[in-house]
């Protein structure tokens, strides 16, 4: 049996409204549980269109055929009008996810703002963004939030420090192999991190890898004897690619791959996890910096 953590990022209003119910049905059909990370504040994701001036982002959007993949309502959200408040309007879907037995955590208050400004925010601004998101999701769920995942994996040592006071059991803020405890500025261990170590659909699909070949590509990258942490998006696998994701789950089962929530990958005693740094780095297929485990 190959153990794998399944992380589902929910970035937008439409992804929550339309993608999450479809994914809940698919996971129920497969008898699987996962971790859902919700964005709960305003949906301003369409403001990323200004990044088209950057060649790397333009190429990524072109390579993944973003307009057909996401739809124009997602690509334009929050541009000419205020972004819809995701948590306020769609909180019942977050409670439904929790009631179905899935792990639920915080992705962001404002996904676009986090990806765009996290690198320059002050410690106070970082804390305020986390607090707003955590308080909103806790009110929706009726219980404290126990885990989080930085939007776009935009995290570094400052983000690690900012999350310390919130009582999360773990965070999934970076890319890399194997759960670890990030080293804080004073040298002490921080809240455990569960990194993602498998590529996402939008990072690899393009001229060299057609959509139809993606399931073959990704299934070959799961391996026994290590943490496999895989991320999908409600806006992709919960919408246009839902049939392909359903087939991926079927094929994964035949290969002995068993998906589970990320929290179940942690040892009973987190003190047994190694210490490592969480630093800024680069990853093929992504535009800009993101958090990576080092070493």
Swiss-Prot record:
Gene3D superfamilies: Glycoside hydrolase/deacetylase
Homology family: Belongs to the polysaccharide deacetylase family. ArnD deformylase subfamily.
Catalysed reaction, written as an equation: 4-deoxy-4-formamido-alpha-L-arabinopyranosyl di-trans,octa-cis-undecaprenyl phosphate + H2O = 4-amino-4-deoxy-alpha-L-arabinopyranosyl di-trans,octa-cis-undecaprenyl phosphate + formate
Protein name: Probable 4-deoxy-4-formamido-L-arabinose-phosphoundecaprenol deformylase ArnD
Keyword Ligase set for record: no
Any one cellular-component term (Gene Ontology): membrane
Enzyme Commission number(s) from the entry: 3.5.1.n3
Record keywords, A-Z: Antibiotic resistance, Hydrolase, Lipid A biosynthesis, Lipid biosynthesis, Lipid metabolism, Lipopolysaccharide biosynthesis
Pfam family, one: Polysacc_deac_1
Pathway entry: Glycolipid biosynthesis; 4-amino-4-deoxy-alpha-L-arabinose undecaprenyl phosphate biosynthesis; 4-amino-4-deoxy-alpha-L-arabinose undecaprenyl phosphate from UDP-4-deoxy-4-formamido-beta-L-arabinose and undecaprenyl phosphate: step 2/2; Bacterial outer membrane biogenesis; lipopolysaccharide biosynthesis
Function: Catalyzes the deformylation of 4-deoxy-4-formamido-L-arabinose-phosphoundecaprenol to 4-amino-4-deoxy-L-arabinose-phosphoundecaprenol. The modified arabinose is attached to lipid A and is required for resistance to polymyxin and cationic antimicrobial peptides.
GO term, biological process aspect, one: response to antibiotic
Organism: Pseudomonas aeruginosa (strain UCBPP-PA14)
Residue ranges annotated for the NodB homology domain, each copy included: 2-260
EC class (word): hydrolase
Molecular function as annotated in GO: hydrolase activity, acting on carbon-nitrogen (but not peptide) bonds, in linear amides
């Amino acid at each position: 049996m190959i153990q794998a953590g399944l992380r589902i990022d929910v970035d937008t209003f439409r992804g929550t409204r339309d993608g999450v119910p479809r994914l809940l049905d698919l996971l129920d059909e497969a008898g699987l549980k996962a971790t859902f990370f919700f964005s709960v504040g305003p949906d301003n994701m369409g403001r990323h269109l200004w990044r088209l001036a950057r060649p790397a982002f333009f190429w990524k959007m072109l390579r993944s055929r973003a307009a057909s993949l996401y739809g124009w309502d997602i690509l334009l959200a929050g541009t000419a009008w205020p972004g819809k408040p995701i948590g306020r309007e769609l909180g019942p879907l977050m409670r439904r996810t929790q009631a179905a037995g899935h792990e639920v955590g915080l992705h962001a208050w404002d996904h676009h703002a986090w990806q765009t400004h996290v690198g320059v925010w002050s410690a106070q601004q970082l804390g305020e963004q986390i607090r707003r998101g955590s308080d909103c999701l806790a009110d929706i769920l009726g219980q404290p939030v126990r885990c989080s995942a930085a939007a776009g994996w935009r995290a570094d040592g400052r983000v690690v420090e900012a999350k310390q006071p919130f009582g999360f059991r773990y965070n999934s803020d970076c890319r890399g192999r194997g759960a670890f405890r990030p080293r804080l500025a004073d040298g002490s261990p921080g809240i455990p991190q569960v990194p993602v170590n498998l590529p996402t659909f939008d990072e690899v699909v393009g001229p060299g890898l057609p959509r139809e070949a993606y399931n073959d590509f990704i299934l070959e990258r799961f391996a026994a004897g290590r943490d496999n942490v895989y991320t999908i998006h409600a806006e992709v696998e919960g919408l246009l690619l839902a049939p392909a994701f359903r087939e991926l789950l079927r094929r994964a089962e035949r290969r002995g791959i068993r998906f589970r929530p990320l929290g179940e990958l942690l040892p009973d005693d987190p003190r047994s996890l190694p210490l490592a740094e969480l630093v800024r780095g680069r990853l093929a297929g992504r535009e800009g910096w993101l958090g990576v485990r080092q070493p």
